[in-house]
Each structure stands twice: as C-alpha cells, then as structure tokens.
From Swiss-Prot:
It comes from Arabidopsis thaliana. Residues 36-56 have a biased composition (Basic and acidic residues). Residues 29-74, 148-173 are annotated as: Disordered. This is Ribonuclease MRP protein subunit POP4. SMART domains: POP4. One of its GO terms (molecular function) is ribonuclease P RNA binding. InterPro entries: RNase_P/MRP_Rpp29-subunit, RNase_P/MRP_Rpp29_sf, Rof/RNase_P-like, Rpp29/RNP1. It comes from the Eukaryota. The gene is POP4. A motif (Nuclear localization signal) lies at residues 160-167. GO terms for biological process: rRNA processing. Coiled coil: none annotated. Residues 57-66 have a biased composition (Polar residues).
Length: 296
C-alpha cells in the first residue's frame, strides 16, 4: 500500500513539471509572435507614409510661367545686381579674352613633363604627387640685395688694395719673377746687396733701439743677409751658407760661395746671420707666412 502511494506521488510531480515547461514554452512563443506582428505593422506604416508623401508631391500645382517675376538688373532695389565699384570692375577678367592654345604655354609644358616622366605621371594622376611650377620673371635691371652687394664691393676693394701692394705667389711663379737665371747665380754679383742690407739694418736698429732687436728682425727685410743653415730637416742643406736673395712664405733662397742656388725650407730649420758684431739665431718657424715677406 505504501509503495503505491509513492509511485502515485512521483507521477503527479512529473506531470506538474511537464505542465510548467509547456506553459513557459507557450509564453515564449506568444512573445515572439507579438514582436513579429509589431515589426510587420511598422513596415506597413512606413510604406503608407511614403505613398502619401509622393501623392501629395504629385498633387502640388506647378508654377506657371506668368507667375515668375522677372528682376530688372537696372533696378536699384535688387541687391543681387548692385553695380560693382569701378576699381573692382576693372580687375575682373574680360569676357572677350581668348586663351592661347599654341605650343610653349605653361599647360603644354606641364603636360609634356608629365607624359615624359613615366611613373611620375601615373602618380600625379592618382593624386599622390603634386607638380610644382617654377614660373619666374627675369628682370632686365636686376637689383642685388644690400648684403650681397656690400660683400662683393668689399671683396673687390680688398683685391684691388692687395694687387697694388703685392702679387700672389701663383702670379709670381707664372710671371717668372721668382726664377733666377743661371748666369745671374753668382755670389760676387750679390756682395753689394749684402753691403746695402748691413747699412739698412744699422739704420733700423738706431731708430728702434737694441732692446727691440728681436722684434725688428721679425719684421725686417732679410734680402742680402749672409745666412748660415745650422739645422734643417733635409740633412743635405745643413751647413749651407751664403747670401739670401729670395724669400717666400716657406723658403729662403741662398746663393752659396761656389755659385749654387739653394732653396732651404723655413719649417724645422735654424739659421744664423751675422750683423756687425752680433750673431743672431733665427728659428725658421717664426718666419713662416710673415705679413711683410716681400714688399713688391
């Protein structure tokens, strides 16, 4: 008896659960149908509204030609046709202007460059590359800026002053002024020059004083001085002595007693000159590129 009641209760519970599931499924189905009906109603209402609007547009009366009011351009009350001022009217493009289609125009040049440049033309057509036009007007009376004009003027003045006082080394070599012919490379020919140099130096020392002898020698003209090469980076020139007859920015030209012309570099060289009772040692590095090497 007890087992029958248990089975009966389980069957009743199962039926109740199935009824609940069925009720939930019916509710979901009803909700979906309602949503679908609302969408259908909304679609039909939109179609009706569009149909009404098109019908109203067709039913509107078209304006007749007689109803359009013509505006007189001479009427002062019309703002759209107010006359322009005289300066503005002159600057407007004239209606009778004809554009030239002849060759050589800017348009033809641009097209020619585009078609000739190959890949660049394709890039230009695609908009990835822009074409820059350099349209310059060359003036007959070109006026330089103040800075460039003043700079060129100063340079020309400087060159003119230098050309008056001295010649460049390049011009000296080209003109042959630095070349001493072999028939003039005689020690005896330059002995009078040595005597003139001694008198010149003695007068110079009297004017400047013995205390400033070193400064005097640095600025003095040494052409005609009897010079002895005590040290030189070229071993064959060490011990050379004679009269100095030519000076450049980097060398001393010496005529020896055996009538030979030697060009001794100043750099890393030591020279000794005899002046009256003094023996003066000169370092060649101090005499490189002197401002007053030779006054010509």
């Amino acid at each position: 008896m007890g087992t029958e009641t248990v089975v009966h209760d389980q069957a009743r519970w199962a039926m109740a659960a199935m009824e609940r599931r069925l009720a939930v499924a019916k509710a979901q189905l009803l909700q979906q149908q309602q949503q679908k009906n609302e969408k259908d109603k909304k679609g039909t209402s939109d179609v009706d509204v569009s149909m009404k609007e098109s019908h109203q547009a067709d039913s509107l009366p078209t304006p007749s030609k007689t109803s359009i009011k013509k505006v007189d351009p001479k009427d002062d009350d019309s703002v759209a046709y107010t006359k322009l001022s005289h300066p503005v009217d002159e600057n407007l493009l004239a209606t009778n202007v004809k554009f030239s289609s002849a060759k050589g125009t800017i348009v033809d040049k641009v097209l020619h460059n585009l078609l000739r440049s190959g890949d660049s033309a394709q890039k230009y057509l695609q908009g990835t590359k822009s074409v820059k036009l350099d349209n310059y007007i060359l003036l007959d009376n070109f006026v330089q800026s103040r800075s460039s004009a003043s700079g060129s003027k100063k340079a020309s003045q400087k060159d003119s002053k230098r050309s008056k006082s001295r010649m460049s080394m390049k011009r000296l070599k080209k003109s042959g002024a630095l070349h001493i012919p072999k028939d003039l490379q005689k020690f005896d020919l330059f002995k009078p020059m040595h005597g003139m140099w001694e008198s010149y130096m003695m007068k110079l020392i009297k004017v400047t004083g013995k205390i400033q002898l070193s400064l005097t020698l640095l600025s003095a003209d040494l052409h005609g001085a009897f010079m002895f090469v005590a040290e030189c980076k070229i071993a064959s020139f060490t011990g050379v002595q004679g009269i100095m007859v030519r000076e450049t920015s980097e060398t001393f030209g010496i005529i020896t007693r055996d009538d030979k012309f030697r060009v001794v570099p100043k750099k890393l060289s030591v020279f000794i000159i005899q002046l009256d009772c003094w023996k003066i040692t000169l370092h060649g590095d101090k005499f490189i590129s002197r401002d007053n090497i030779v006054q010509r």
